[in-house]
Amino acid sequence: MLNRIVAFIFLIILSPIFLIVALFIFIEDGFPVFFKQKRVGINYTFFQIYKFRSMKKNTPNVATHLLTNPKQYLLKIGGIIRKLSLDELPNLINIISGEMVFVGPRPALYNQDDLMALRVLAGVDRLKPGITGWAQINGRDEISIEEKVKYEKEYLQKKSFLFDIQIIIGTFTSVLMSKGVKH
């Protein structure tokens, strides 16, 4: 419940940033400014994640690292949106609806069977997905799925309010330094 209340407060406080990002996306590539995608939630349930669109409308609906030339699909504003993780701000809607939390494993794409199989083996599938997580601040896009699951399992074992605060602080540091951002 605390996650939902805090997300609602952040949604109100950050609404000017929402409007500015939406306006830039609209000016460059029109509507829709949001991107929704099928993701895997707690206990292997599916939900629609909301993000700001950083890619052009005609981009194939696959993980960015699977695209032959991801930069050709990136909006001009898209690089900045991703570098500052502004594309994740609409995840607040997912937190308010109860599908996500602030700290947990990043939600896998519906077709990332290899990642989900490892998460099930590690018991990490029992966690609600988060906007940020232990794996996010320990490598993000630069680590293998095995390493991600190792960090997620470690998070499961150490999960606490103070550990979540440590991860949130680490997230701000990572975002400011653009640590772990590939695309």
Task: Go through each PLM region and give its residues.
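Residue-level "hotspot" positions that anchor or transmit function at local structural transition points
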Residues: 11, 65-68, 125
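Alpha-helical membrane-protein architecture signal
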Residues: 2, 49, 70-77, 89, ...
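Hydrophobic structural segments characteristic of membrane proteins
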Residues: 32, 93-183
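Short, cationic motifs built from Arg/Lys/His that form the positively charged side of catalytic pockets
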Residues: 39, 51-55, 73, 81-82, ...
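Short, well-ordered beta-strand elements within core beta-sheets of diverse protein domains
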Residues: 77-84, 153-157
